[in-house]
């Protein structure tokens, strides 16, 4: 297969104003995507965006390109999972999201969903890239596309989310803190939980275009932890900027990550006799999850890092539950992509159904100490091929033996080298991670 030039593991992403996230590029991308998608079936696409200030500029450019290719567009501010869901209900040929997910406001990106609400196949992404090499042309005036606003997009998605929560349950006995990262779920998630009966306290629900993911949300739960303790809430839930990640916090302020959420959902499905197959994690998934699932007799496999690879393994095994510890939780019996609100609701259903607290549920899985170091580099060359870095990794692996793991990889979405070390002794794990990280820094 040819190598993709622009598309990464989660669409096209970068710093706004620099290639490829410029109005010129996005206009051409919209045109090329429109040309390719119009050959697949209906000439209709859905567009959603998060709360970044640059989203308005990029949306206009994308709409112009799609219109030049003759595609009709249905638009509205909505989370990534809502785009995946509504693409199917609108019978659109594709869904397009303008977002950089958990990244800061000065980044943005474009990602596509197929008509089935799943990530676009590699072949379609390659076809779009090939089309971009051609000169931009315009369909005849009578064939030009047009953009339409979906006025009830939020309401449609709220009802969908509520529909994934068991009808015999409600949340009337629970106080919940909801952190929306000043992102796309700010006008949706609080209403979902309120309409199910919960007492809801909100943080991260005042977007201004530049505060998305800023010390709030799934990538930084310190504010949520403090608010849960201050309000004496039963638990808290944090979403990221585009709503496809979720991290929870128990009543004692402990973080409950994507691994633990998947474990809770799988164990509850097993308790109800409804578990189909096993669970897919990634190379970053904590060893504690693997051990806990094994003790329950639940099969477990690892994929490469990235929700698209988790999805590939789920489809390969015909399983339903997959997750990344960063908070991407995929529940294929509910929706075709990672959905923070829906995943959180399934944990809440387990809390209500088992009459256990979030802490009691998550305590069934003991996390191994794990340290992740992120080293920024210019993106040139590959520090991971350095003899010094390879030697440092091998030295740590020899010390850990069978009691831990080391993983070094390039980020698929940012110019970062990620160093992960996991083992039984927290102090040693921290020391080993810093040793390898220093070797990487010395060779960047």
Swiss-Prot record:
Name of the coding gene: glmM
Name of the protein in its database record: Phosphoglucosamine mutase
Entry-linked NCBIfam families: glmM (TIGR01455), PRK10887.1 (NF008139)
Cofactor: how and how many bound: Binds 1 Mg(2+) ion per subunit.
InterPro entries: A-D-PHexomutase_a/b/a-I, A-D-PHexomutase_a/b/a-I/II/III, A-D-PHexomutase_a/b/a-II, A-D-PHexomutase_a/b/a-III, A-D-PHexomutase_C, A-D-PHexomutase_C_sf, A-D-PHexomutase_CS, Alpha-D-phosphohexomutase_SF
Active site residues per record: 101
Zinc-finger as UniProt keyword: no
Family matches, as SUPFAM superfamilies: Phosphoglucomutase, C-terminal domain, Phosphoglucomutase, first 3 domains
Alphabetic keyword roster: Isomerase, Magnesium, Metal-binding, Phosphoprotein
Reaction catalyzed: alpha-D-glucosamine 1-phosphate = D-glucosamine 6-phosphate
One Gene Ontology MF term: magnesium ion binding
In-chain residues carrying the UniProt-annotated modification Phosphoserine: 101
Transmembrane feature ranges: none
